[in-house]
Amino acid sequence: MFLEKVGNHKRCNMLYDPSHYVLQNLDYLAHIDIYHEKIKMFHVKDAELNPSGKQGVYGGFQSWVNRAGRFRSLGDGQVDFKSIFSKFTSYGYDGWAVLEWECCLKHPEDGAREGAEFIKNHIINTTEKAFDDFAGSGADIEANKKML
């Protein structure tokens, strides 16, 4: 839709923020599968959506603490960051992963300290070779007979 309107211009890219997808009840993992080539930056930000009989996605008249949808510190919300970082790694993502923090409960200094460590612990160091690379190297029949 939007890409069509801009003629799929090469400079039209995306800042991926899974917290907003949680609050919209969108599949943020499938979004990576669809748009991974356009994602150039990633806001590492958590959120939770806990709808009730009185409020859902749109609970804007409540304080942030009492809203059904609210931002949380990394790891305290509903975003599956292990899956996100795994998907980005599998697609060869080499863009920025930036902490964005707006928790309605936790102190900002705690959020920043914990957030930096959280991101560091989720970054995947990509392997240089597959676990079964040895399989294509051929077999030493005589050595195998000797071992057996």
Model segments located where?
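Acidic/histidine-rich catalytic cores of soluble enzymes
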Residues: 1-78, 130-131
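A structural alpha-helix within SAM-dependent methyltransferase catalytic domains
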Residues: 3-4, 36, 85-89, 116, ...
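A structural motif corresponding to the C-terminal end of an alpha-helix
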Residues: 6-9, 83-94, 126
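A short, acidic, flexible beta-alpha connecting loop/helix-capping segment that sits on the rim
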Residues: 99-107, 136
